[in-house]
Amino acid sequence: MQEERRLAVLRAIVEDYVATEEPVGSKALVERHGLGVSPATVRNDMAALEDEGYITQPHTSAGRVPTDKGYRLFVDRLTTIKPMSTAEKRAIATILDGAIDLDDVVQRSVRLLAQLTRQVAVVQYPTLSRSTVRHIELVALTPTRLLVVLILSTGRVEQRLVDLAAELGEEDLADLRTVVNRAALGEIIADAATALRALVPAEDATPTGAVVDVLVEAMSDHRSDERIAVGGAANLARFGDSFDSAVRPLLEALEEHVVLLKLLGEATAGEILTVRIGHEGPYQELSSTSVVATGYGPGDEALARLGIVGPTRMDYAGSMAAVRAVARYVSRILDEG
């Protein structure tokens, strides 16, 4: 009973501190939250929470604020992630359903996450090396020039032009299209490239060799594996009182995409929604920063990560709900192709 009451007091302190940005006192807790006990009892509970390291007193005359340990207990004891409202779900669907390609999906997702959470949003582009081949299309632009289109399971589309040494008729083009699709369809990139290379001898000058060369080249392009989109940096203006401790280091991190990728990578394991709070992260200089992140991708496979980063004083419940909802919706879009 006592433990549950103290947890309720901690929950109230976290919610009030996030909402008001002010240290929280016992009188305010009793007035706002109807805890059913006297201010004296709440003060005793707050003293116990402080002794255990869950809250701290920033100034002698001030109320209490949560510590990283307090935020962690708060997050761990969230029995359910509150669902998005109907209006929020409708907004997510409206914004993301209008995307025309993978780049558009990523850019819309990062803007949406930043708006929903009022934090900095980070979305990693799907990793090419873990993609599978969905389709290969060959389009004759002229009898000696082809447009080769590689479509991956992530929704990524690669296009290459191929100039042929000799003319290629419609029937031969259809046969070639069948051959390359039979070799690569459904395979992960590395296996697809190997299968395609096996179709022709080295330095083959035939149309098949020319098409295989550009397909393998497209499959070897790993530039997108470390591409990320960032949005919502202006949201950090809300935390001006924490500029030196939280905002400045985070602004500097936004310039280093490798740092952001590591933050997302440290926070996520597959499609599990995870939270890293303050000192739990990999960078000491970002010890006042929290990360809420998860993986996304078609089916049950997480090909990339998305999430939000911000000062530890954040709405964890709301941020977790938004990150999970956007990831699920983006995954569905990629799954549907």
Curated annotation (Swiss-Prot):
<dbReference type="Pfam" id="PF01628">
    <property type="entry name" value="HrcA"/>
</dbReference>
<dbReference type="InterPro" id="IPR029016">
    <property type="entry name" value="GAF-like_dom_sf"/>
</dbReference>
<keyword id="KW-0346">Stress response</keyword>
<keyword id="KW-0678">Repressor</keyword>
<dbReference type="InterPro" id="IPR002571">
    <property type="entry name" value="HrcA"/>
</dbReference>
<dbReference type="Pfam" id="PF08220">
    <property type="entry name" value="HTH_DeoR"/>
</dbReference>
<protein>
    <recommendedName>
        <fullName>Heat-inducible transcription repressor HrcA</fullName>
    </recommendedName>
</protein>
<dbReference type="InterPro" id="IPR036390">
    <property type="entry name" value="WH_DNA-bd_sf"/>
</dbReference>
<comment type="function">
    <text>Negative regulator of class I heat shock genes (grpE-dnaK-dnaJ and groELS operons). Prevents heat-shock induction of these operons.</text>
</comment>
<keyword id="KW-0805">Transcription regulation</keyword>
<comment type="similarity">
    <text>Belongs to the HrcA family.</text>
</comment>
<dbReference type="GO" id="GO:0045892">
    <property type="term" value="P:negative regulation of DNA-templated transcription"/>
</dbReference>
<dbReference type="InterPro" id="IPR021153">
    <property type="entry name" value="HrcA_C"/>
</dbReference>
<dbReference type="GO" id="GO:0003700">
    <property type="term" value="F:DNA-binding transcription factor activity"/>
</dbReference>
<dbReference type="InterPro" id="IPR036388">
    <property type="entry name" value="WH-like_DNA-bd_sf"/>
</dbReference>
<keyword id="KW-0804">Transcription</keyword>
<dbReference type="GO" id="GO:0003677">
    <property type="term" value="F:DNA binding"/>
</dbReference>
<dbReference type="InterPro" id="IPR001034">
    <property type="entry name" value="DeoR_HTH"/>
</dbReference>
<dbReference type="InterPro" id="IPR023120">
    <property type="entry name" value="WHTH_transcript_rep_HrcA_IDD"/>
</dbReference>
